[in-house]
Amino acid sequence: MYNLIKDVKKLNPLVIHYTNNVTINDCANVTLAVGASPLMSFSYEEVEEMVSVANSVVINIGTMNSNMLDLFLLAGKAANKYNKPVVLDPVGVFASKARAELTSRLLNEVKFSVVKGNVSEIKFIGGFNVRGKGVDSFDEEEDSTEIIRKIAEKLECVVVATGKIDIITNGKGTYKINNGTDKLKGITGTGCMTASLIASFMAVTENILEAATMGVLTMSLSGELANLNNPPIGTFKENLMNAIYQMDIDALSKNSNIEFLN
């Protein structure tokens, strides 16, 4: 699985993003840092053409509005048409009725390879009661592994639930990642950037579970390494991007705290 970090850098896959305008710059930069090539678009007119040549697709509802629904649906359906792996990041799905309805329609009409969110977002999608505010989760203290696994079975895709312990599962096999730092919460967009990393790895392998795990692990481990010596938040963000850029098989092998459950 760790070899995927080399494959991304070697193949430089094209990852098209239909994402939010708060974190779009960071998502583009993190895609470059890991070795892929980002394309950011809000254009209806080019969806078919762009998705057909991309290697993977990101759909992120973070700054959704009434005009975005059709764009997201168009992009998702194009990804399915051209057999491109696509990740959904349902940012703040529990925060409003409009977000919940948008996400429900996307899940009903598009076959996603990965659905990625924090624990509260994923549990909400699965029909469970959640504790959260805005786009932030308060559900991280309890072990939600079995709940997330059942949601993955229901959605018939890989599900990523980030938190104190990150959970990645397709309903059959499950990875749990114990790397990371609370300081990742102090930067807007680390979740969005994680979706970009997942898409970068999905673009170079058919093993979606491993690709999603590598995306989450790269962010969590890079955050841990970036926080050595407890730098202030601005320095931490710079360190984070540098750590992602420098991530390699050796660093993954030496520092990953990961377990696999059947």
Curated annotation (Swiss-Prot):
Pathway: Cofactor biosynthesis; thiamine diphosphate biosynthesis; 4-methyl-5-(2-phosphoethyl)-thiazole from 5-(2-hydroxyethyl)-4-methylthiazole: step 1/1. GO terms for molecular function: ATP binding; hydroxyethylthiazole kinase activity; hydroxymethylpyrimidine kinase activity; magnesium ion binding; phosphomethylpyrimidine kinase activity. It catalyses: 5-(2-hydroxyethyl)-4-methylthiazole + ATP = 4-methyl-5-(2-phosphooxyethyl)-thiazole + ADP + H(+). Substrate binds at M40, G189. InterPro entries: Hyethyz_kinase, Ribokinase-like. This is Hydroxyethylthiazole kinase. Its EC number is 2.7.1.50. Pfam families: HK. ATP binds at K116, T162. Catalyzes the phosphorylation of the hydroxyl group of 4-methyl-5-beta-hydroxyethylthiazole (THZ). Belongs to the Thz kinase family. Its cofactor is Mg(2+). GO terms for cellular component: cytosol. Gene3D superfamilies: 3.40.1190.20. GO terms for biological process: thiamine biosynthetic process; thiamine diphosphate biosynthetic process. Keywords: ATP-binding, Kinase, Magnesium, Metal-binding, Nucleotide-binding, Thiamine biosynthesis, Transferase. Coiled coil: none annotated. It comes from Clostridioides difficile (strain 630) (Peptoclostridium difficile). The keyword ATP-binding applies.
